[in-house]
UniProtKB/Swiss-Prot annotation:
Protein name stated in the entry: 3-isopropylmalate dehydratase large subunit
Family to which this protein belongs: Belongs to the aconitase/IPM isomerase family. LeuC type 1 subfamily.
Gene name for this UniProt entry: leuC
Purpose of the protein: Catalyzes the isomerization between 2-isopropylmalate and 3-isopropylmalate, via the formation of 2-isopropylmaleate.
Cofactor: [4Fe-4S] cluster
GO molecular function: 3-isopropylmalate dehydratase activity; 4 iron, 4 sulfur cluster binding; metal ion binding
PROSITE patterns (alphabetical): ACONITASE_1 (PS00450), ACONITASE_2 (PS01244)
Organism annotation: Listeria monocytogenes serotype 4a (strain HCC23)
Catalytic activity: (2R,3S)-3-isopropylmalate = (2S)-2-isopropylmalate
Record text on subunit structure and interactions: Heterodimer of LeuC and LeuD.
Length: 462
């Protein structure tokens, strides 16, 4: 019987262990940031251990960094963590994309941009959205601080092999529907736990026709459906994305010959298989307090089916039967490791251009990396957003999570391109609605959610 992409990647990296039991995997790339690494570095010091492979470790700061006045950090905990990362990287010989560096940004954007993220690798990071890197035909998953220390010391990690799930996605995406809507649809349909215990491979016509940036959006949110990791087979789109980047292989053609073997065999079988027709999708909006609580734009919010729904409606200040258009928005956030790449900003700017943010909205655009910010400014996207009334910020995780100065006020509804709508995720009492960048941009200039498939209702003015 043939092997899946996941089987091939896993088998390449097993150092020790029997099938069915935890196995020791070799780690090709360890990405770190300021929040989950300090304890791990301190553990090395206490045991007087070296960091085994600093050349396979790369650091940046993203979670705590301010996105304005970036060198004047007011939060003492954030300042201490950032300074600790600088000190630790210098002491242990780790390459650091420091504050203000041309390579600094959200860790899951910096890896691909620099060419560190490549097909065939096992990539770990002390962050739950490490599945993003699976879009390149890699195994990527998040780890805890104790595991970060283990990788520091050994360049390996113990893991129980998950089962395999194949999600076949075919059909052309309708106008106004994006990669973000695909993953929101999957989670809304099957739930936040449907991927628990699985490594998910996304494939099919729709995936093949996507850019790398779109593919990363889908893999980024694999964890929100419960999966340990999400991945896609590498192809010419992947190879051309990696080619010419700072850390791309010296012998690119040799690497590509190997990467081309990273495909699921025709006779391979997944433990679970799901089919999806992308051509019938609508823009999605979440109404509740986890990504499963989402609806197509044309549908009303569902009836209360259990205590979780009851609590979600109470927290969000909404009721069954309402529609997304009725939500009283106060904030719009375009950013995060899900949707802060150049193509995301270009699509948002296309809608925003020539319009104005409504008076009831405070709108932020936070590029996910310095590279994206520089590229956006080189083609004038910053001017489009600023002229429309958006705040144009420095790179970082920003309003995706309440660990930095960018937070949504208590009780305020925010249209967000991020990946989690948990209670308090964007700040105490914040009410988060997950959408695509286009939906968020249109909401900013209309003052509420609209059906972006109908361009006639995208209008400016205050």
């Amino acid at each position: 019987m043939g092997k899946t992409l996941f089987d091939k990647l896993w088998n390449r990296h097993v150092i020790y262990g029997k099938e069915g039991e935890p196995q020791l995997l070799y780690v090709d790339l360890h990405l770190i940031h300021e929040v989950t690494s300090p304890q791990a570095f301190e553990g090395l010091r206490m045991e007087n251990r070296p960091l085994r492979r600093p050349d396979k470790t790369f650091a940046t700061m993203d979670h705590n960094v301010p996105t304005e006045d970036i060198f004047n950090i007011q939060d003492l905990v954030a300042k201490k963590q950032i300074e600790a990362l600088q000190t630790n990287c210098e002491e242990f010989g780790v390459t650091l994309a420091d504050m203000g560096s041309d390579r600094q940004g959200i860790v899951h954007m910096v890896g691909p941009e620099t060419g560190l993220t490549q097909p065939g690798k096992v990539i770990v990071c002390g962050d739950s959205h490490t599945a993003t890197h699976g879009a390149f035909g890699a195994i990527g998953f998040g780890i805890g601080s104790s595991e970060v220390e283990h990788v520091f010391a050994t360049q390996t990690i113990w893991q129980q092999k998950p089962k395999s799930m194949g999600i076949e996605i075919n059909g052309k995406l309708p106008k106004g529907v994006y990669a973000k809507d695909i993953i929101l649809h999957l989670i809304a349909t099957y739930g936040v736990a449907f991927g628990t215990g699985y490594a998910v491979e996304y494939y099919g016509e729709t995936i093949r026709n996507m850019s790398m940036e779109e593919r990363m959006t889908i893999c980024n949110m694999a964890i929100e459906g419960g999966a340990k990791m999400g991945m896609m087979a590498p192809d010419e789109t992947t190879f051309e994305y990696v080619r010419g980047r700072e850390y791309a292989p010296a012998d690119m053609e040799k690497a590509i010959r190997d990467w081309k073997t990273l495909q699921t065999d025709p006779d391979a079988e997944y433990d679970l298989h799901i089919e999806m027709d992308a051509s019938i999708l609508e823009p999605y909006v979440t109404w509740g307090t986890n990504p499963e609580m989402g609806v197509p734009f044309s549908k009303a919010f569902p009836e209360i089916k259990d205590m979780n729904y009851e609590r979600a409606y109470e927290y969000m200040g909404l009721k069954p039967g309402q529609t997304a258009e009725e939500i009283e928005l106060g904030y719009v956030f375009i950013g995060s490791c899900t949707n802060a790449r150049l193509s995301d900003l270009e699509e948002a700017a296309r809608i925003v251009k020539g319009n104005k943010v409504k008076n009831n909205i405070r709108a932020l655009v936070v590029p996910g990396s310095r590279q994206v910010r520089n590229a956006a400014e080189s083609i004038g996207l910053d001017k489009i957003f600023i002229e429309a009334g958006f705040e144009w910020r420095e790179p970082g995780c920003s309003m995706c999570l309440g660990m930095n100065p960018d937070q949504v006020p208590d009780g305020v509804h925010c249209a967000s391109t991020s990946n989690r709508n948990f209670e308090g995720r964007q700040g105490k009492g914040a009410r988060t609605h997950l959408v695509s960048p286009a939906m968020a941009a249109a909401a900013a200039i209309n003052g509420h959610f609209i059906d972006i498939r109908k361009e006639a209702i995208i209008s400016g003015g205050n």
